[in-house]
Amino acid sequence: MITLYEAAASKGHYQAINNLYLLYTNGHGASGTLYAPQPSRARKWLHYGLDKNWAMANYWLFDALYEGNAGYRHNPKLGLAYLQKAVDLGVPLAQYELARIYDKRFKDYNTRERLLDCAARQGFSAAMNELSRVKRIRYGNLKESLQLMHNALRYGGEGGGEAALKLTMVYAKNKALMDKFIATPADPVREAAYAELEKALMGTGTKSGNPFYTFPRLDEVLPLPPAKTRWKGIYSAMSKEDAAFYQNPPDTAALAADILKRGIVKKEEVYWTPRKD
């Protein structure tokens, strides 16, 4: 996967560069394998984003300064200044991160909610998922909480996967962690559908998920009650492109081998030994 990201990044692909910065910073491989962080590689792509004047690069710089990543000295105060800049430029991940800081450090719940709302309005599923929890626990607004979880799932991502898991519980007979929805009747069709969507995004113990899936047709095939479901399997909620990919995923190993053979990416640029600890 690193080879594929590097190949896309060499063409200026924004999402691939974002993934590489985070990957080289945290050292978490897609299969769960841990690697030693690669500060010089993370710094390379951080500087690329800054040179391109990307708003998201301000968030990467916040992360580097606040945590001492990518070869930067630990400087939380300066890091927070770049986080605020990213927030002002409308970066939803930055808005979400600052909302968490206002929550945990300052207990300023009103500012937290305003920031989460800003990120949610841009389709950031993690913010929708968190805002759903706020509506449910702080205000007891189950209708709005349910809608936010549903919206988060439509946009995919880890936030969408977590929302799908919660929705599975909402429509199960045993509500588990979602006991505030005790009055919601069990619905086996919806429960199974949300479970299928959660596995696609988050994976299982033996198969990795794909958080990049989105479900633009979710409202058509799996609308919230009282509307009836038209569920015909996960493909019915996906775009045609995602459905084709889900049914016949490409051979990533073969793609990576071809990229290396063509010299688009050099082997030494992607070789990364796992940590032994």
Language model segments and positions:
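Structural signature of tandem alpha-helical TPR/SEL1-like repeats
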Residues: 2-3, 31-45, 71-82, 105-115, ...
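Short helix-capping/linker turns of helical repeat alpha-solenoids
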Residues: 10-15, 20, 27-28, 51-56, ...
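Extended amphipathic alpha-helical coiled-coil/heptad-repeat regions
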Residues: 32-35, 48-52, 60-89, 94-107
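TPR/TPR-like (Sel1-like) alpha-helical repeat modules
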Residues: 118, 146-158, 168-176, 181-205
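Long C-terminal extensions of eukaryotic subunits of large macromolecular complexes
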Residues: 217-277
